[in-house]
């Protein structure tokens, strides 16, 4: 049996095959196709239209982006620090799929990308030359430049990823809902998420995600183009950039159709080590003492100035162009990427508590990101301020993609290091496109199993769509067009994120009601109940039954008990289903499920699962050389109850079912009478 809740309703025999979500797919594809073709065919018109819409969005919603980003952060930290932080992303009996070290390594990889190579030099130098307020080319401008860079890549953005990852993991692994954004809205809209509301939400997620990925790929293409120019004297133009996009699309198609994606994952892991090596190279071959002092100062400045930066709208200074190019762009970019990275974070975090998840997401990748930005950013600033290389800063202002390579040119073995940086950037670029195609395919598929991936042809389509959109943006106005489009396209999903917060909080409140109902004593049982005497109890504790005895217990005790309860409820006009599903690991055994339907409220599900464990050496079964034994464990909707029915009588099994049912009814009652609450619950068979 798997470590997570083994439910009959999850068995593939009871479900249809995965299928395309036609509405989300066709609407998203049509919007992207129209946008891309219009941009490619009518360059000037598209550029003017983007600028006009951007002016409207920035003048109308700049305050909103700042406030929204801060509220996302406050919500995530509040949930993690509250009592809800103990709730697991999955049933309460679930265990993490990955060890702490492996999980940390995967979180670490989430913090690395080609955009870090681009902005680690370009942003600090841009702010140093032209800060949003105050005089440029001063020590204060240098400090501001690093603080703004850390702020744009800091806690606020990672909280957006954590919010979506937390919601996806909670609703998918605890409530068995699809691994899509609409699932988080079930507590608000109920089954309406299967209609236009859900389609709109998922479409907004797809549109935002593909623009976020296209922006990253576009930035990567421009930077790689310059890297190839440095190494092989290739020209910097749209033709070379188009060829790079085509190469990425082809590699992605090969990856998703031939199974070499495992090889790409290995390469991306190697890439992490190479990236760390590149960072250490700059640290130890540069002015190490200065860089370490600057790192400590940067962290201190970031922490001390963070409260004022979080809501800094420059209401009086009004550097509109600066806001559009930096803070608004970054917040929209984080919003656009949040479904993509959130899905990745959710998938690797099943079985962890919300507090563990948020802590890991906010600390591990953030530490690396801040260290990378500080080392490269301060190296560039040191080269400009103390070595007098003002040309580096001027180059960044005119061609930001040149900054990273021009900084590397100041160090020994430049051709070799530039080659390593180019290969690293290319792999980051390809893996972003590859992962993006997979995630977009998942968002446009209706799965019968949340662990499935989208069909290959769908991932191929999205790989081509990412390439087409990236090319369209580069043809319009390069990186500026990508930034402008991200600010615009990230806006709709930013509203969805507030609905995600509301749905998640509403569902977490139900955990309080469930806990309260579980703590209440069931009604006293009247009559002569055969309570296990101490000798029977001792025999039961020491017993480790095999397949034969477990099957006998199921057939002679558990099955009659379950059917007795079902028949009595059916006499009272209650809809009840009983299922017997063979185990995959031992077809002689089966698990028993009884589902009591409660109309619009959450159904009561009680399951009896034979769970196989390794027989302990001290047991009689272990001494006889038998490898396994079984426990008859009970599962409710929220997961394992931790008990074992082996040795129970029929009446005791019936009493256990009724105790759990009564507590469930108490839970529904508490939820029903709570102020302002509507009892909308996920349908486990949906």
Curated annotation (Swiss-Prot):
Membrane topology classification: Multi-pass membrane protein
What are the protein's UniProt keywords? Answer: Cell inner membrane, Cell membrane, Membrane, Stress response, Transmembrane, Transmembrane helix, Transport
Topology feature Cytoplasmic, residues: 1-22, 82-100, 172-203, 259-265, 347-356, 434-459, 506-686
Query: Null phenotype?
Result: Mutant is impaired in osmo-dependent choline uptake activity. The betT1/betT2 double mutant is completely impaired in choline transport.
Q: Which terms in the GO cellular component ontology are assigned?
A: plasma membrane
Topology: which residues are Periplasmic? 44-60, 122-150, 225-237, 287-325, 378-412, 481-484
Establish whether keyword Transmembrane is in the entry.
yes
Signal peptide range: none
Membrane-spanning intervals of the chain: 23-43, 61-81, 101-121, 151-171, 204-224, 238-258, 266-286, 326-346, 357-377, 413-433, 460-480, 485-505
Q: Where in the cell is it found?
A: Cell inner membrane
What molecular function does GO assign, one term?
A: transmembrane transporter activity
Source organism's superkingdom?
Bacteria
Keyword Transferase annotated:
no
Q: Which NCBIfam families match?
A: bcct, PRK09928.1
Family recorded in the similarity comment: Belongs to the BCCT transporter (TC 2.A.15) family.
Question: What job does the chain carry out?
Answer: Uptake of choline in the presence of high salinity. May primarily serve for osmoprotection.
**What name goes with this protein?**
Osmo-dependent choline transporter BetT2
């Amino acid at each position: 049996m798997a470590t997570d809740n083994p439910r009959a309703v999850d068995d593939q025999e009871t479900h249809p095959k995965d299928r395309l979500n036609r509405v989300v797919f066709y609407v998203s594809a049509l919007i992207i196709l129209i946008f891309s073709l219009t941009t490619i065919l009518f360059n000037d018109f598209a550029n003017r239209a983007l600028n006009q819409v951007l002016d409207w969005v920035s003048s109308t919603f700049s305050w909103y982006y700042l406030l929204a980003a801060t509220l996302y952060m406050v919500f995530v930290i509040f949930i993690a620090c509250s009592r809800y932080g103990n709730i697991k992303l999955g049933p309460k009996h679930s265990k993490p799929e990955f060890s702490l070290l492996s999980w940390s390594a995967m979180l670490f990889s989430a913090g690395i990308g080609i955009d870090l190579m681009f902005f680690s030099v370009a942003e600090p130098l841009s702010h140093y030359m032209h800060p949003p307020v105050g005089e440029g080319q001063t020590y204060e401008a240098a400090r501001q430049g690093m603080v703004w860079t850390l702020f744009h890549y800091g806690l606020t953005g990672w909280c957006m990823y954590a919010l979506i990852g937390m919601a996806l993991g909670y609703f998918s692994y605890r409530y068995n809902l699809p691994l899509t954004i609409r699932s988080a809205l079930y507590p608000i809209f109920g089954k309406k998420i299967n209609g236009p509301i859900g389609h709109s939400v998922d479409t907004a997620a797809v549109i935002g995600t593909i623009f976020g990925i296209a922006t990253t790929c576009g930035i990567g293409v421009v930077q790689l183009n310059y890297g190839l120019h440095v190494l092989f004297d290739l020209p910097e133009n749209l033709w070379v950039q188009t060829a790079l996009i085509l190469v990425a699309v082809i590699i992605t198609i090969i990856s998703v159709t031939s199974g070499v994606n495992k090889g790409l994952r290995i390469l991306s892991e190697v890439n992490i080590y190479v990236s760390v090596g590149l960072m250490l190279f700059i640290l130890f071959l540069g002015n190490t003492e200065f860089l370490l002092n600057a790192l400590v100062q940067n962290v201190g400045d970031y922490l001390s100035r963070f409260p004022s930066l979080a809501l800094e709208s420059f209401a009086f200074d009004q550097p509109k162009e600066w806001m559009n190019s930096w803070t608004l762009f970054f917040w929209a970019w984080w919003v656009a990427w949040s479904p993509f990275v959130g899905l990745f974070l959710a998938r690797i975090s099943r079985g962890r508590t919300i507090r563990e998840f948020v802590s890991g997401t906010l600390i591990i990748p953030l530490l690396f990101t801040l260290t990378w930005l500080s080392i490269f950013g301060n190296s560039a600033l040191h080269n400009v301020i103390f070595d007098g290389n003002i040309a580096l800063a001027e180059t960044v202002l005119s061609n930001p993609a040149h900054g990273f390579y021009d900084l590397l040119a100041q160090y020994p073995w430049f051709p070799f290091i530039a080659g390593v940086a180019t290969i690293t950037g290319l792999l980051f670029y390809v893996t972003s496109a590859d992962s993006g195609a997979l995630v977009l395919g998942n968002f446009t598929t209706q799965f019968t199993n949340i662990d499935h991936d989208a069909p290959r042809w769908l991932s191929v389509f999205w790989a081509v769509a990412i390439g087409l959109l990236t090319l369209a943006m580069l043809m319009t106005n390069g990186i500026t067009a990508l930034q402008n489009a991200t600010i615009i396209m990230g806006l709709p999903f930013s509203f969805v994120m507030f609905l995600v917060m509301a749905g998640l909080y509403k569902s977490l409140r139900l955990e309080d009601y469930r806990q309260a109902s579980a703590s209440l004593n069931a009604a006293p049982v009247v009559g002569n109940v055969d309570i296990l005497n101490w000798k029977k109890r001792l025999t039961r504790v020491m017993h480790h039954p095999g397949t034969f005895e477990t099957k006998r217990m199921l057939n002679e005790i558990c099955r009659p008990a379950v059917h007795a309860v079902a028949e009595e409820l059916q006499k009272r006009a209650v809809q009840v289903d009983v299922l017997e599903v063979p185990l995959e690991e031992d077809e002689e055994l089966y698990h028993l499920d009884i589902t009591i339907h409660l109309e619009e409220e959450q159904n009561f599900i009680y399951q009896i699962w034979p769970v196989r464990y390794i027989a302990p050496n001290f047991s009689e079964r272990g001494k006889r050389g038998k490898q396994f034994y079984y426990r008859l464990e009970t599962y409710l909707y929220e997961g394992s109850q931790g008990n074992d029915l082996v040795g129970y009588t029929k009446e005791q099994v019936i009493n256990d079912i009724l105790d759990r049912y009564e507590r469930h009814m108490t839970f529904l009652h508490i939820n029903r009478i709570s102020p302002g609450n509507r009892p909308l619950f996920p349908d486990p068979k949906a």
